[in-house]
């Protein structure tokens, strides 16, 4: 039996500005992955998606999932748009090199011109110089459940897509999307747990666990698979 043990790699950029009230997660997937995405959503948040969106008090890194595209840390929410803007101004956010995006959620019928106008309204509530090309921080607004929401937007890390071009692969290896989902479902998003892949093959699941910040060990009875897993990692 050959064992492959990975090291735990973690990194974070922490910007403490606002305390979130809750989090809005936006999902995207191919139609044949809908049930798989709902399974993951139940494991991570305790609920299934509603129109590819989950609103939750549970904080998760978007990159843990192959389906989560971004997480909005909602700091201001109000049904009245003018009061919503006043609340943002009251925060007194002062910084340079920011940008404001508009998240289009299913059911939002605002046209492009209206969305641009909303972005500008919110941008004028922030004291500082925007940077549309290389922002240091991204804010976003959206309209969900008859309420306007504002907060810091965290996007997925798409580097995991490169793992489809691993040095070694078997014809019966599971796909990268399935591997990434298995990690999030098995762990329920808790990076403190240690995972075990008892038949790791070329290390597809292990690689996705490592890049998401999990500790994982793997083993395989096939020496060829063992060496290929090491090279892939």
Regions found by a protein language model. Name each.
Residues 20, 136-138, 147:
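Broad gene-expression machinery/nucleic-acid interaction feature
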Residues 141, 147-189:
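SAM-dependent Rossmann-like transferase core, predominantly class I methyltransferases
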Residues 174-233:
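Conserved S-adenosyl-L-methionine
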